[in-house]
Amino acid sequence: MTRNILALSAALLLTFSSLFSQKQTDPSANLNKLSGTPVPPQQWDEWFNTEVQKFKEKNQLGKTNMAQFTIPVIFHIIHNGVAIGTAPNISAARISAQLAELNKVFGGTGTNPSAISHYSQFVANPGISFCLALTDPTNLALGEPGINRIDAAVFGVNTSTINNDQALLSFIDYTVKPAIIWDPTRYLNIILSEKGPTANVLGSARFPANTSLMGLGAVGNATNDAVWCVTSTIGNTLTPGTLAGYANGKTLCREIGHYLGLRNIWGDVVCGSDYCSDTPPATGPNYGCPTLPHDINSCGPGLSPGGEMTMNIMDYTNDACRFMFTPEQVIRMHTAMSQCPNRNLLGTHGLCTVTLTTPPGPAI
């Protein structure tokens, strides 16, 4: 009996390993790990899951009408000295297109889920909107709302020349972010730059934390609590970026999901947990636009009868095939927005209104 159980366990392990290995290779491109967001340690999971439970109890298990949030955004566009509108110094129109995509996805008005009948009941409205900041940290009016353009020459290295993923992420975190970040308790800082041609990673973020956890590598602090995305992923279907499969703005949506406390749907290990009971387990990330239902019960009998939730924003599938968050994911995001430093003050400073300080004019 024991021998049979061991043999079965070994067979299941080999099966899951094979599935995960297959999913780690996108047949159309070398995009094995699209997100560079570090996996948070157990200490963070324990703390944040406790906060989620407190939030549920406070809001009657999330069944009352929850608050609406508006997050002011500043896009730091890193370029190589080219004219505005020439990549990577993308136009304000591309930024506006990306903002529209954020508001659609986080406003629960993404792609109509009727074609995915099994999961239509799990589509939730996060009730989160984004606006372009009108003023800088000194309260001066921005020439372009929500945009801060920066020549890469100030860093001595252009990120478009860095092909190693870890080197690229380290450069963003330890050189770029500390030099340009605006107060993360007031702004959602979004840094845009290009990557080296053979780098795989498309974005990264930091998880929310309380003051005692800000020393952990995976969570945000005053110098690194910003989201980074590859510029060619920025846009929407009407004004797209240029990266095939990932040109419609969903990369930034996913990274902001991490910024608001969401884990990947596969829990970052084979059949791991994202701590959301309404996202079925998955053996790993999915790519492309899988035929649905995809990988039914991949993690065990009866665990995902409708297949893996490949249309969830927190997967790696193509932008055209991702659109939804679930109620449990919304609760985690609202927990971050209401109870975490660097999140719970966002939107309280009037940064998207027109009360501002203008520079003094010439003497008359």
Identify the role of each PLM range.
Residues 1-28, 102, 358:
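Bacterial Sec-dependent N-terminal signal peptides
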Residues 7-8, 38-41, 243-245:
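Short hydrophobic "helix-edge" motifs at membrane interfaces and signal-peptide entry regions
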Residues 8-12, 142, 364:
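Intrinsic disorder/low-complexity segments
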Residues 9, 13-16, 40, 175, ...:
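Intrinsically disordered, low-complexity regions enriched in Ser/Pro/Gly/Gln/His and often acidic
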Residues 19-106:
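Primarily auto-inhibitory N-terminal propeptides
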Residues 65-67, 73-136, 149-253, 259-362:
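Extracellular (secreted or membrane-anchored) zinc-dependent metallopeptidases
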Residues 139:
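Active-site pocket-lining segments that scaffold enzyme catalytic pockets across diverse folds
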